[in-house]
Amino acid sequence: MGFIFSKSMNESMKNQKEFMLMNARLQLERQLIMQSEMRERQMAMQIAWSREFLKYFGTFFGLAAISLTAGAIKKKKPAFLVPIVPLSFILTYQYDLGYGTLLERMKGEAEDILETEKSKLQLPRGMITFESIEKARKEQSRFFIDK
């Protein structure tokens, strides 16, 4: 009688472990998908912000360029055109971010760094572990208890 009971109990435990493993895997997959979607939404917001900024800055740049050019012609001082140079760099950067290939180039550079420069990505003192977190937590709680 005990043998039959323990056999069914072992089978039940095995099924329970498989279910828990499958459940943990599903939870991890959901978490990874959620993080990926959050990252995509943040990137979409960044691109949308850049495009919106470009509209306002483009208008400002156009008005500034016309005004500075008119001032340089009227006063016969080409020095009035100097502010157009840094403003054009900002305009070009924002256009490249919003409509160009800046994000693809940055992604490619990041992939290259991940492949060829792993040593630069190492955390100081190595990987964070459960033990290091517990040690810091205990030290911090001891600090608050002593005071």
Swiss-Prot record:
Answer yes or no on keyword Transmembrane: yes
Q: Which domain of life is it from?
A: Eukaryota
Q: How does it sit in the membrane?
A: Multi-pass membrane protein
GO BP: chemotaxis; inflammatory response; positive regulation of plasminogen activation
Provide the protein's localization. Answer: Cell membrane
Q: Which residues cross the membrane?
A: 53-73, 79-99
User: Pfam families of this UniProt entry?
Assistant: DUF2368
Q: Which keywords does this chain's UniProt record carry?
A: Cell membrane, Chemotaxis, Inflammatory response, Membrane, Plasminogen activation, Transmembrane, Transmembrane helix
> Which ranges does the record list as Extracellular topological domains?
1-52, 100-147
Q: Name one GO cellular component term.
A: mitochondrion
Q: Does the record bear Transmembrane in its keywords?
A: yes
Tell me which tissues or organs this protein is expressed in: Expressed in peripheral blood cells and monocytes. Expressed in adrenal medulla.
Q: Which residue spans belong to the Cytoplasmic compartment? A: 74-78
Coarse class of the protein's main subcellular location:
membrane
| Functional note | Receptor for plasminogen. Regulates urokinase plasminogen activator-dependent and stimulates tissue-type plasminogen activator-dependent cell surface plasminogen activation. Proposed to be part of a local catecholaminergic cell plasminogen activation system that regulates neuroendocrine prohormone processing. Involved in regulation of inflammatory response; regulates monocyte chemotactic migration and matrix metalloproteinase activation, such as of MMP2 and MMP9.
- Assembly and oligomerization: Interacts with PLAT and PLAUR.
Protein name in UniProt: Plasminogen receptor (KT)
What species is given as this protein's source?
Homo sapiens (Human)
Its encoding gene is what?
PLGRKT
